[in-house]
Amino acid sequence: MPSTDLLTLKAFEPYLEILEVYSTKAKNYVNGHCTKYEPWQLIAWSVVWTLLIVWGYEFVFQPESLWSRFKKKCFKLTRKMPIIGRKIQDKLNKTKDDISKNMSFLKVDKEYVKALPSQGLSSSAVLEKLKEYSSMDAFWQEGRASGTVYSGEEKLTELLVKAYGDFAWSNPLHPDIFPGLRKIEAEIVRIACSLFNGGPDSCGCVTSGGTESILMACKAYRDLAFEKGIKTSEIVAPQSAHAAFNKAASYFGMKIVRVPLTKMMEVDVRAMRRAISRNTAMLVCSTPQFPHGVIDPVPEVAKLAVKYKIPLHVDACLGGFLTVFMEKAGYPLEHPFDFRVKGVTSISADTHKYGYAPKGSSLVLYSDKKYRNYQFFVDTDWQGGIYASPTIAGSRPGGISAACWAALMHFGENGYVEATKQIIKTARFLKSELENIKGIFVFGNPQLSVIALGSRDFDIYRLSNLMTAKGWNLNQLQFPPSIHFCITLLHARKRVAIQFLKDIRESVTQIMKNPKAKTTGMGAIYGMAQTTVDRNMVAELSSVFLDSLYSTDTVTQGSQMNGSPKPH
């Protein structure tokens, strides 16, 4: 009796014969068509078409999509058209002037120092001059700024200043000269690994801030992906993930794939699964994300990371040093978020936020040293010797690390738990009260310290303008239009939260008398920027702000900034 395999093969024989006939015809057609060409011509055409195909592939498949590049080209050509381009530029220049006029930090009534003094000043004279500069600072001591300063307590400040002073000349680049500083940084990393439930192989690095921590994780995963044969690595991140991931993509030649959010402002896990490709180098979650203070579903995304064998980075820069103390503070989170979750391979956390260290202090942590090794940079052939650097910077200020260590030791576990308790209690109180104010709503279900507000009745930027007029400083957000307030220890004081609610209620009541009125000032500029289709134009407007940071011209002298060739 014939076998099943033999019967199956015989069943396909007619189809194989047909295929052979057509393949023979195709071969004869091609051979006949090529007889009129000489061999060198066939080779030349093959080379030309191969190059064209390779060029076409590289042109289409770039980190920036073809559609995005097409739009940029169209907008660029439009701005070069004689009449339309001139009108666009005039409007752009007017907007730049409006932005400059609304920059409060440029309104300085004292002359800028533009050259070294001929004779050096005494210590007392220098300190007296510095008092003039510190007196320009805004109202942060009163607790009216969103985030920005996370403690500001006088005794803590004295401790941090003393710790910095003792290590002012130290540099982690030279551990042989400053072994005590090396010990300090190693202890900071180990303490953080323990707080985030890292195992014995967990490790990390001290960085200059959250952006550098994120950059380092992205660099590590890019190099890991490259080793696997992925030439253009993709970062799959929620729409709400920090802009530092875009910066990493720009710096390191990666592509960022943004994933939409659910109505609760969490990442859509199913959409994230669809976004994963053979070029995906890393997945991203936030705990919490900056815009709305919402925590992404880390365990669900971690399952994708494990299934597809992709590293998962959890960005805890903003709330990391709250999340690790939430349970002991009496506010347990619904889901784990750290190295306890299988699939989480790295975490970024800022010690200079709720770790209460001075600015310029953050951490990037890894579940295993094998990931951190890809972060390192080593040049074995430099004439100056073998150069090895763990992070972006070479030399770093040891005083910052010493002050960070001092803050950790000063607060201790009990101190951090108590601080977390005060902040979350204040945040939960504000959230419950804000949800009951007619005309505004709270985005998602923020569980930590950030509360984002929106409105279906009026332009929310009007509320930001009115609160600014009352002395508050809120963060303006976009897509969708919203504002947020980040609660710190300064806001946990008795009357700050009450005054904030009072001013919000008064402002909303005033707006609701004429809800359709147009926004003015910076709110209008921000709203306009959000609706502008040409994002390059928005970037150009943003450069006005960046230029202004280094302006040494008084407001009355015009709007020309340092580094600008001429006034616009």
UniProtKB/Swiss-Prot annotation:
Modification sites for Phosphoserine: S564
Cytoplasmic compartment segments: 63-568
Ranges that cross the membrane: 42-62
This protein's record includes keyword S-adenosyl-L-methionine: no
Localization, UniProt: Endoplasmic reticulum membrane
Residue list for modification N6-acetyllysine: K353
Pathway where it operates: Lipid metabolism; sphingolipid metabolism
Topological category with respect to the lipid bilayer: Single-pass type III membrane protein
Gene3D superfamilies per record: 6.10.140.2150, Aspartate Aminotransferase, domain 1, Type I PLP-dependent aspartate aminotransferase-like (Major domain)
Topological region Lumenal: 1-41
The enzyme's E.C. designation: 4.1.2.27
GO terms (BP aspect): apoptotic process; fatty acid metabolic process; sphingolipid catabolic process
SUPFAM superfamilies, sorted: PLP-dependent transferases (SSF53383)
Reactions that this protein is recorded to catalyse: sphinganine 1-phosphate = hexadecanal + phosphoethanolamine; sphing-4-enine 1-phosphate = (2E)-hexadecenal + phosphoethanolamine
Cofactor: pyridoxal 5'-phosphate
Keyword Transmembrane helix belongs to the record: yes
Keywords of this entry: Acetylation, Apoptosis, Endoplasmic reticulum, Lipid metabolism, Lyase, Membrane, Nitration, Phosphoprotein, Pyridoxal phosphate, Signal-anchor, Sphingolipid metabolism, Transmembrane, Transmembrane helix
GO cellular component: endoplasmic reticulum; endoplasmic reticulum membrane
Chief location: endoplasmic reticulum
A molecular function GO annotation: pyridoxal phosphate binding
Tree of life domain: Eukaryota
Subunit structure: Homodimer.
Protein's job: Cleaves phosphorylated sphingoid bases (PSBs), such as sphingosine-1-phosphate, into fatty aldehydes and phosphoethanolamine. Elevates stress-induced ceramide production and apoptosis. Required for global lipid homeostasis in liver and cholesterol homeostasis in fibroblasts. Involved in the regulation of pro-inflammatory response and neutrophil trafficking. Modulates neuronal autophagy via phosphoethanolamine production which regulates accumulation of aggregate-prone proteins such as APP. Seems to play a role in establishing neuronal contact sites and axonal maintenance.
Membership in a protein family: Belongs to the group II decarboxylase family. Sphingosine-1-phosphate lyase subfamily.
Protein name as annotated: Sphingosine-1-phosphate lyase 1
Organism: Pongo abelii (Sumatran orangutan)
